[in-house]
Regions:
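PRPP-associated nucleotide enzymes
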Residues: 1-129
């Protein structure tokens, strides 16, 4: 029963993340042209599954980047396997056998509002130029 629905949930999460990346790309937060022929660094606060990586790869698949680096403080064993398959380099401080969700590993689980995140990303992009 659990395995049956697990795949469905993962697929639905991937679809939602894919839609989110398409919307962010359309809104011009990070234009694809700015990533061409550059090193792309994907950073996550923790990776319990490969859904975020799969979604990022969907966004990046039409971009000819030079190198892909994935960095995270911790990830599950299966996710690290996926990282090795898709990235040129990985930086993962801890590989966790029984991953319990990202929030479990942080004392402060405050997530900034979406507008603050977008503003921060836009400021970073402006500094690239």
């Amino acid at each position: 029963f659990n395995m049956e629905y697990s795949q469905l949930f993962e697929q639905k999460k991937l679809e939602k993340l894919s839609k989110m990346h398409r919307l962010l790309g359309r809104m011009g937060v990070i234009k694809r042209d700015m990533l061409k022929r550059h090193t792309v660094i994907l950073i996550a606060d923790g990776l319990g599954s490969s859904v975020s990586i799969d979604s990022a790869m969907l966004y990046l698949k039409s971009i000819k980047y030079t190198k892909l680096i994935i960095a995270t403080p911790f990830a599950s064993v299966n996710t690290v396997d996926k990282m090795h398959l898709v990235a040129d380099e990985i930086a993962c401080l801890n590989v966790i056998q029984n991953f319990m969700g990202v929030n479990h590993y942080y004392e402060d689980n405050h997530i900034p509002p979406h507008s603050v995140i977008i503003k921060t990303v836009q400021e970073m992009v402006e500094n690239w130029r």
